[in-house]
C-alpha cells in the first residue's frame, strides 16, 4: 500500500480550471509526445482520474504535466489531462500552464517572451506578456485547424435530427449552428445543453468516423460546440463547449475557438489577418486570429492564434492513497 503525493498549482483560464502538476508526475517512455501520451494512458491513467475526478477534482477539472521536450526546437513538453482523457491539445490549458510555469520559474525559455511547446498534437508557439512577476496575457499559435466535414446529421434527444459541421482545432468539434430545431444556445440552460450533448456525440461517433489526416492516433469526436449570438460588444460569436461526461467549458475554449475560426475561414467569413473574438458562456473572451493558410494531408487548413489570460488560485498538495476506496476518483452522471 502506498500514498502518492502530487504538488499542484491551481488556477483558471478565463474561468475554466487548470491544475498544473508541478511535482509527482510519472516518468514516461516514448520518442515523441504521442508515444508518451500512449504510455501514460496505458500505465498511469489512474493519476489523471485521481486528480481530475471527484473527490479531488470535479466535472470541469482540467490539468497538465510538464516534461522535457522530445524535440530540439521546443522548450518544454506538455501532457494534458482532463476528465475526458488525455487530449492531444488544450488551448485554455496551455494558456494557464504557460502563465503558471513562467510565474513560478518552472521553465526557462530560450527566447524571453516565447515558449515553444511540444504537445501530442504538434508544436505550439506561446508568446506571453509579463509585467513584473505576473504574466498578463498569453497568445498561442496553434496547430493547423481545418473543416473536416459538412452537413452530418444525427438524432438528438429534445431536438430531433440535428445537422452539424465538424472542424478540427486540436480536437474534433461538432459545431451546431442555427437550424430548424435549434436557434441559439441562449434558449437552453447549461444543464439542458449537457443533457443533449452526450447523446449527440455518441450518435455522431457511432455513425461517422473522425480521424486526423496525418495523425491517425488522433481520432474520435470529443466536443460539441453550441453556438449563439454574442452578448459582449467586442465578440463576433458566442459558444458553449461540451466535453467529458457533463462539463461545459467556462472559457471560450482554445481548441474550440481554433476549430470555429477554421470553420468560418472555410465558409469565406475570415481571411488571413482577420480577428475573431469568441465569447464564453460566462462572458469571458478569447481573441483569435487567422495567422496563415496551411495544408493537412489533402485538406485546406489555417494556422490560428488565440489570446487569453489566466490567474493562479492556490497551491495544492494532493494525496492518492491506495487505502482509499475512491483513490482513482469517481464520476456521478
Swiss-Prot record:
The keyword Membrane does not apply. The keyword Glycoprotein does not apply. Keywords: Isomerase. The active site is at 90 (proton acceptor), 253 (proton donor). It catalyses: trans-4-hydroxy-L-proline = cis-4-hydroxy-D-proline. Substrate binds at residues 91-92, 223, 249, 254-255. InterPro entries: Pro_racemase_fam. It comes from the Bacteria. GO terms for molecular function: 4-hydroxyproline epimerase activity; trans-L-3-hydroxyproline dehydratase activity. Its EC number is 5.1.1.8. Pfam families: Pro_racemase. Catalyzes the epimerization of trans-4-hydroxy-L-proline (t4LHyp) to cis-4-hydroxy-D-proline (c4DHyp). May be involved in a degradation pathway of t4LHyp, which would allow S.novella to grow on t4LHyp as a sole carbon source. Belongs to the proline racemase family. This is 4-hydroxyproline 2-epimerase. It comes from Ancylobacter novellus (strain ATCC 8093 / DSM 506 / JCM 20403 / CCM 1077 / IAM 12100 / NBRC 12443 / NCIMB 10456).
